């Protein structure tokens, strides 16, 4: 038993050592070779030895130059040598004369150039003046056309004010020459109730006003001239608005004076229609001025009376 354990121990140690050796060998194998051992090392050595005509290798690096230090004695001797200044000769005098001659020549040329300019200026000015004249003529024509255009536009834009119609002052009607009368009365044995009568009058555009009676005006809102009026048929013929709920009457009377404001035929038509509507609303009857039943013949008589006033 002890021998078996010893054998197993030895085999395990050998196996471990083999694994370690194999690991180190594989790691060594995977590492890159050094630059010396690489195949490109020879190429780089050859390229380093080859240089161009200026002394630079393939990488653009030149040879290393060692500069020797100059001894102090030689440097001091160079500094002690006097600097020779350039000697000036009399040759520049010719240059001065040449420059003077050039200046004189330039001065002598200026009057000629100025004269030439003066001779050329009138020609240019004449051409410019001619062009200016043409431009001015064109501008003048343009201004004339523009001014005429503006004048026509102004004439068209100016609108003559239309004369306002003269408002003729209304002539006074004077004394009444005729009165057209209509009656709206309750049926026999009945009376008109004020609480029912007032809403009907307001719906017909009557307005309570002067003399404590109702009036029908030109405007439905109750403004303008009075066309006709409505009064109580019972004396004194007035109404009391504060007591309309307790008010009762046998009937009301509608009347229109001639002459009147506006068209009398139109005014009478409005009054007749209002009387018919009021009689229907309160359940009464329509009578003429003589308190007779209204008829078509009576209507024609009223129209004849109106036309007589118009003639």
Swiss-Prot record:
Keywords of this entry: Cell cycle, Cell division, Cell inner membrane, Cell membrane, Membrane, Transmembrane, Transmembrane helix
Residues on Cytoplasmic side: 28-311
SMART domains according to UniProt: ZipA_C (SM00771)
Listed GO CC annotations: cell division site; plasma membrane
Membrane topology classification: Single-pass type I membrane protein
Residues on Periplasmic side: 1-6
SUPFAM superfamilies: Cell-division protein ZipA, C-terminal domain
Annotated region (Disordered), positions in chain: 46-114
Pfam families: ZipA_C
Keyword DNA damage appears in the UniProt entry: no
Bilayer-spanning residue ranges: 7-27
InterPro entries: Cell_div_ZipA, ZipA_FtsZ-bd_C, ZipA_FtsZ-bd_C_sf
Extent of Basic and acidic residues compositional bias: 62-83, 94-103
Location(s), subcellular: Cell inner membrane
GO BP terms in the entry: division septum assembly; FtsZ-dependent cytokinesis
The family this protein is said to belong to: Belongs to the ZipA family.
Alphabetized PANTHER family for the sequence: CELL DIVISION PROTEIN ZIPA (PTHR38685:SF1)
Quaternary data: Interacts with FtsZ via their C-terminal domains.
Function, in words: Essential cell division protein that stabilizes the FtsZ protofilaments by cross-linking them and that serves as a cytoplasmic membrane anchor for the Z ring. Also required for the recruitment to the septal ring of downstream cell division proteins.
Protein name per the record: Cell division protein ZipA
Gene this chain is encoded by: zipA
């Amino acid at each position: 038993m002890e021998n078996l354990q010893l054998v197993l121990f030895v085999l395990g140690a050998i196996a471990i050592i083999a694994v370690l050796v194999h690991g180190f060998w594989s790691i060594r194998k995977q590492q890159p070779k050094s630059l010396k051992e690489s195949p490109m090392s020879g190429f780089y050595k050859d390229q380093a030895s080859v240089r161009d005509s200026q002394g630079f290798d393939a990488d653009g690096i030149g040879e290393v130059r060692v500069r020797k230090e100059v001894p102090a004695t030689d440097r001091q001797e160079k500094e002690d040598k006097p600097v020779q200044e350039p000697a000036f000769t009399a040759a520049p005098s010719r240059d001065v004369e040449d420059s003077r001659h050039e200046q004189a020549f330039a001065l002598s040329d200026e009057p000629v150039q100025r004269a030439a300019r003066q001779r050329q200026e009138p020609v240019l000015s004449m051409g410019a003046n001619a062009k200016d004249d043409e431009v001015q003529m064109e501008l003048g024509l343009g201004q004339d056309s523009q001014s005429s255009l503006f004048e026509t536009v102004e004439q068209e834009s100016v609108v003559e004010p239309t004369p306002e119609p003269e408002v003729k002052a209304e002539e006074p009607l004077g004394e009444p020459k005729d009165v057209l009368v209509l009656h709206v009365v309750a049926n026999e044995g009945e009376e008109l109730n004020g609480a029912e009568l007032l809403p009907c009058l307001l719906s017909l555009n009557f307005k309570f006003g002067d003399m404590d009676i109702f009036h029908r005006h030109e405007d439905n809102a109750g403004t303008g001239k009075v066309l006709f009026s409505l009064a109580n048929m019972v004396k004194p013929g007035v109404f009391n608005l504060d007591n309309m709920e307790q008010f009762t009457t046998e009937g009301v009377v509608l009347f229109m004076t001639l002459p009147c404001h506006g068209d009398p035929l139109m005014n009478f038509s409005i009054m007749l229609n209002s009387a018919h509507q009021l009689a229907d609303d309160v359940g009464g009857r329509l009578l003429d001025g003589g308190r007779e039943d209204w008829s078509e013949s009576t209507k024609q008589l009223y129209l004849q009376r109106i036309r007589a006033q118009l003639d």
